[in-house]
Amino acid sequence: MIKLGIVMDPISEINIKKDSSFAMLMAAQERGYQLFYMEMADLAIVNGVAMGNMRPLKVMNDANHWFELGEAKDTPLSELNVVLMRKDPPFDTEYIYATYMLERAEEQGVLIVNKPQSLRDANEKLFTAWFSEFTPETIVTRDANRIRAFHQAKGDIILKPLDGMGGTSIFRVKQDDPNLGVIIETLTQYGNQYAMAQAFIPEITKGDKRILVVDGEPVPYALARIPKKGETRGNLAAGGSGVAQPLSDSDWKIARAIGPELKKRGLIFVGLDVIGDKLTEINVTSPTCIREIQAAFDVDITGMLFDAIETRLGQ
């Protein structure tokens, strides 16, 4: 029997209709896995051994009663076969420390999804630079003059921090916007923090597409997150609405080009963000949208994921 641990935000606070981690847990349980629940505070290293204060978990597809937890037991992570790291950003130093603990468990024989080193290496915004042939024109800098020159040249840009999530602190700055200066100061903390500027992509009105890639293979359907009226962010967390749709030719091209590199890096479950035919982000920490896509189309994303996990476990 496969023993699966998950590190996530409090399970008591999730929306099971939309939560991808919950979809994964339900699928694993249906396959007969034993589930163990952890939050970040439950991870520890004791004399070089990665430990988890883990609780046996049962999940139910019931909006009033969706989980039951057993008694916590301090256990070496090496007693598990696989750990899903599903903690949401912020990708802060605490998150980085957690990846080191999980890397220790990996060295002790546990499959970690996604690979801890690659979680550190692949910043969700910056990692797109490795695939710049697919991105809008982009700069990453903390230099206000460089941002101003980029804005001058493009006229309509998006400015965002490198560590945001769910559309937080994303600004659209048009030509002659009087707020450019204060937005630059805020995002760069007066020149002390890197920020990203991208040429605005008008196709955002048709949605910011989330394309899921499982062990290098694109899922054939995406979730287009359509911004609400008067908004430039499609993120569901920012009030956007989701419409599932088949991948376009350009979506396939992007996902197939990036997939092999993701697989090579041990990034087994990844969400690409695409606007029009441009790649804007590569989400590796805890990508979502499984529930919405599986509800709209006959596609078994969690099945793809656990097939990939079992292949890697040699099952």
From Swiss-Prot:
Its EC number is 6.3.2.3. GO terms for cellular component: cytoplasm. Mg(2+) binds at E281, N283. PROSITE patterns: ATP_GRASP. Transmembrane segments: none annotated. It comes from the Bacteria. It holds the Pfam family GSH-S_N. ATP binds at residues 151-207. Its cofactor is Mg(2+); Mn(2+). GO terms for molecular function: ATP binding; glutathione synthase activity; metal ion binding. Pathway: Sulfur metabolism; glutathione biosynthesis; glutathione from L-cysteine and L-glutamate: step 2/2. Binds 1 Mg(2+) or Mn(2+) ion per subunit. It catalyses: gamma-L-glutamyl-L-cysteine + glycine + ATP = glutathione + ADP + phosphate + H(+). Keywords: ATP-binding, Glutathione biosynthesis, Ligase, Magnesium, Manganese, Metal-binding, Nucleotide-binding. The keyword ATP-binding applies. InterPro entries: ATP-grasp, ATP_grasp_subdomain_1, Glut_synth_pro, GSHS_ATP-bd, GSHS_N, PreATP-grasp_dom_sf. Residues 125-310 form the ATP-grasp domain. HAMAP family: GSH_S. PANTHER family: GLUTATHIONE SYNTHETASE (PTHR21621:SF4), RIBOSOMAL PROTEIN S6 MODIFICATION PROTEIN (PTHR21621). Belongs to the prokaryotic GSH synthase family. This is Glutathione synthetase. It comes from Shewanella oneidensis (strain ATCC 700550 / JCM 31522 / CIP 106686 / LMG 19005 / NCIMB 14063 / MR-1).
